[in-house]
Swiss-Prot record:
One of its GO terms (biological process) is manchette assembly. Expressed in testis, in seminiferous tubules (at protein level). Expressed in spermatocytes and spermatids, but not in spermatogonium. The keyword Signal does not apply. Keywords: Cytoplasm, Developmental protein, Differentiation, Lipid-binding, Spermatogenesis. This is Profilin-4. Belongs to the profilin family. The gene is Pfn4. InterPro entries: PFN, PFN_euk, PFN_sf. It comes from Rattus norvegicus. Involved in male fertility. Required for manchette development and acrosome biogenesis during spermiogenesis. Binds in vitro to phospholipids, including phosphatidylinositol 3-phosphate (PtdIns(3)P), phosphatidylinositol 4,5-bisphosphate (PtdIns(4,5)P2), phosphatidylinositol 4-phosphate (PtdIns(4)P) and phosphatidic acid (PA). Contrary to other profilin family members, does not bind to actin in vitro. Its main location: cytoplasm.
C-alpha cells in the first residue's frame, strides 16, 4: 500500500464519516490512488476537473454529475467543491498537484467529511503537493 493510500485511509476513512476517497493527478488528469472499493471513471475525473476550470458561479448553478448521480453544488471556489444529493455528498479539494475527492453517505456527518478533507488538502499543499 502506498503512502498516499495510507493517508486516505488514515485521515479520511479513519474518521468513519468518509465513505470513499481518491486522489487525481492534475497534470496527467488521471486517477492516482483510491480507497478500496471506490472507483472513479475517467468521465468523472473530467467532470471534477471541469468543475474547477469553469467559473465557480456556473459550477454552482449547473451542479455536478459524479458517479452516475446529479449533485447540487453548495460550494464552488478556486480550492473546493462541495455537492450534495439528499443525504449523500462529495467534497473535492484542489492542491498544487492533486484533486482530493471524498464522499459521504447516509448516517455520516458531512461537516466531519469536509473538515477531514480540507485538512488533508492543506497538509498536501504545505508539503508542496
Amino acid at each position: 500500500m502506498s503512502h498516499l493510500q495510507n493517508l486516505l485511509l488514515d485521515t479520511l476513512l479513519g474518521t468513519k464519516h468518509v465513505d470513499g476517497a481518491a486522489l487525481i493527478k492534475l497534470q496527467e488528469k488521471t486517477l492516482c490512488v483510491t480507497s478500496p472499493g471506490f472507483s472513479v471513471m475517467p468521465c468523472d475525473v473530467r467532470t471534477l476537473l471541469n468543475g474547477f476550470a469553469k467559473n465557480p458561479l456556473l459550477t454552482r448553478r449547473e451542479g455536478l454529475y459524479f458517479r452516475e448521480k446529479d449533485y447540487k453544488c453548495v460550494r464552488a471556489d478556486d480550492c473546493s467543491l462541495y455537492a450534495k444529493k439528499e443525504n449523500t455528498g462529495v467534497v473535492v479539494v484542489k492542491t498544487h498537484m492533486y484533486l482530493l475527492v471524498a464522499t459521504y453517505t447516509a448516517g455520516m456527518y458531512p461537516s466531519v467529511c469536509v473538515e477531514a478533507t480540507e485538512k488533508l488538502g492543506e497538509y498536501l499543499r504545505k508539503k508542496g503537493n
